[in-house]
A protein has these predicted regions:
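Short, charge-rich binding segments
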Residues: 49, 79, 102-103
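Residue-level signal for short, function-critical loop segments
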Residues: 60-61, 207
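Residues at secondary-structure transition points
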Residues: 34-37, 64, 68
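Anion-binding (especially nucleotide phosphate/pyrophosphate-binding) glycine-rich loop
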Residues: 38-55
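Oxyanion-binding and handling regions
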Residues: 1-37, 41, 86-210
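DPxDG-like acidic metal-binding loop motif
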Residues: 54-59, 65-85
Length: 210
């Protein structure tokens, strides 16, 4: 008898690499430069292996092209599957706000925005952008903001961290945040709070298409 299993996936399209989390402990990392060449093949192979029926997408902040390419590809996959995929869209900052509300991280965070030199200094308590800053200013900022935390990125040389940096992964039913020797867990229900019929690229600013 042939059993056709269904699969929940979580996809981070808001970092320096694309991260696709599937099954209990498997992760696929794609370079940004590979997206247009590898994306379709990866999604189709995953769906053939285990039918994707639910997809949580970390959908902001990041660069215009990759957000657009990924949302279009996932929407196309849903169309090809006769709309048999449930989408949930969550910004990375909303995820970090969940961590903050639980008391797991401080209120100030430096966030990757797809640029080589610049990052966002974001205030989770007041939910606002403090400023766009240069990575070279991190040590100075850490003196000004003692609770400052670095965004998770997959290339550890991007920040060359000298202060605390987030480390989290997704599993089928939860997301876990590593903090030293402690692991904190968010349930899938806490993450899938924004169901959407179609994914829209969640730009941090409007792209210039002129």
């Amino acid at each position: 008898m042939f059993l056709y299993w269904k699969m929940r996936v979580s996809i981070d399209i808001s970092s320096d690499h694309i991260a696709i989390y599937h099954w209990t402990s498997q992760k696929i990392l794609l370079e940004r430069s590979w997206v247009d060449r590898e994306l379709g093949k990866v999604l189709v192979n995953l769906d053939r292996e285990q039918a994707i029926w639910e997809c949580l997408v970390l959908n902001w902040p990041w660069g215009f092209t990759n957000l657009r390419v990924w949302t279009l590809a996932l929407n196309l996959l849903k169309t090809l599957k006769n709309n048999q995929i449930s989408f949930f869209s969550l910004s990375k900052l909303e995820l970090y706000n969940l961590f903050y509300q639980k008391g797991w991280i401080g209120s100030k965070i430096l966030v990757y925005i797809g640029q080589r030199l610049n990052v966002w200094l974001w205030d989770l308590e007041w939910w606002r952008l403090i400023s766009t800053v240069k990575k070279s200013e991190i040590d100075q900022l850490s003196s000004q903001y003692p609770d400052l935390t670095l965004d998770q990125v997959y290339d550890t040389t991007y920040f060359e961290p000298t202060i605390s940096q987030l480390s989290y992964e997704f599993r089928i039913d939860w997301c876990y945040l590593k903090s030293g020797n402690i692991e904190h867990f968010l349930s899938r229900d806490e993450l899938t709070i924004h169901p959407v019929e179609r994914l829209e690229p969640n730009y941090m600013i409007e792209p210039n298409v002129s």
